[in-house]
Regions:
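Amphipathic, Lys/Arg-enriched alpha-helical "gate/interface" segment within cytosolic domains
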Residues: 1-137
Length: 137
């Protein structure tokens, strides 16, 4: 798996991308790396782009663990941008384990809708600057 993120402090949004294969360890690493970044605020919203997630290798215990260490506050809006059954499955399981409501945690199939959900204009593009962190290949 590879993942990257951009912390957009002025807009209070984290833009995350995950592609390839995702394991328990990699998902936990992403959450911990975000939490440890001094620019990160747990009240930020997030768009997580999972459209290129090809292979989900997370276990049920690993997913439960991830749900408990999610660095975002329960009232933060998290838009999951999905394109495959694997990404949708992960999103729905996390949604269940975190006990989040649809006001905080929603699946989208298009970027403009996800942007609007986190409070940005629908025409806002994905950040074109280099990611703050990139892991994997």
């Amino acid at each position: 798996m590879a993942y990257s993120f951009v912390i957009d402090v002025p807009r209070r949004v984290v833009f995350s991308r995950i592609w390839g294969t995702l394991t328990d360890e990699q998902a936990v690493s992403h959450a911990k790396t975000l939490k440890d970044d001094p620019r990160f605020d747990s009240g930020f919203n997030q768009i997580i782009d999972l459209r290129e997630l090809a292979n989900l290798q997370m276990t049920s215990p690993g997913t439960k663990n991830l749900a408990h260490i999610v660095p975002f506050r329960p009232d933060a809006k998290r838009a999951f941008l999905v394109g495959t059954g694997e990404a949708e499955k992960l999103s729905k399981v996390l949604w269940t384990y975190t006990e989040a409501g649809v006001d905080q945690y929603t699946l989208f199939r298009d970027l403009p809708s996800a942007m609007e959900f986190v409070g940005l204009d629908a025409k806002t593009p994905w950040p074109d600057r280099a990611p703050d962190q990139t892991f994997g290949s």
